[in-house]
Design a protein with these regions (language model features):
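Extracytoplasmic Ser/Thr/Pro-rich, glycosylation-prone low-complexity segments
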Residues: 1-209
Length: 209
């Protein structure tokens, strides 16, 4: 389902800094939720600024080092920047954020599609995805997959923020001028534009390590 858009709220003209309702992870993954950092997370929020957060929404964009300096809650951010879904004037909305999940295969996909940037600018739209999937029957091991489809440099940052410098992950080039091009051409799984990490009770590491 989608949220924060005219499709979900036809009367809304302001679609900046929105968040989904809390998603019950125990209904998608194991009965205990999803492993992340130092425990099992049971609730996830999807935020329009290119991230998901655990336990609480993260509505605003913070111009701080990420991962590391952004305040609570815990976050996974494919492409964290000051996004704005609000259409220009009366034009048709093309930006949207939506989710898909399967309780039988224990996976959740989030898509940020044609996202604009602050102050209703849509000249540099960004499209990317986050795919979370259960790797073991017990639910104690989860794949975190980033997929980048179309990006433009807007000063974005990305990674996995656990609030612990020893376990957090920073995507290649995060915060730099070539971040977008690196995400589209680099990979850690031999597929350009795709990065996969694994979360379990031992922390977070690159897939295959």
């Amino acid at each position: 389902g989608s949220f924060c858009g005219r499709a979900s709220n036809p009367a809304s003209n302001q679609m900046d800094d929105c968040s989904s309702d809390g998603i019950d992870l125990t209904s998608i993954f194991s009965a205990n939720g999803m492993p992340f950092y130092d425990g099992m997370q049971t609730e996830l929020f999807i935020n329009t600024n290119g991230n998901v957060s655990f336990g609480a929404s993260n509505l605003g964009y913070q111009n701080a080092s990420f991962p590391g300096e952004v305040t609570e809650p815990l976050m996974i951010a494919p492409y964290f920047y000051d996004a704005d879904l609000t259409p220009e004037g009366d034009t048709e909305q093309t930006s949207r954020v939506y989710q898909w999940f399967d309780q039988n295969t224990h996976e959740l996909m989030v898509t940020w599609e044609n996202l604009g940037r602050y102050s209703r600018k849509h000249d540099k739209p960004n499209t990317f995805q986050l795919h979370l999937s259960q790797l073991t029957d017990s639910g104690e091991c989860i794949a975190i997959e980033f997929r980048f489809l179309e990006l433009f440099n807007v000063g974005a940052k990305g990674g996995i923020d656990t609030k612990n410098a020893a376990t957090q992950i920073e995507l290649p080039g995060s915060g730099g001028g070539d971040f977008s091009s690196k995400l589209l051409t680099d990979t850690n799984v031999n597929s350009p534009g795709v990065f996969v990490y694994v979360a379990d009770d031992g922390g977070i590491q690159e897939y295959g390590n």
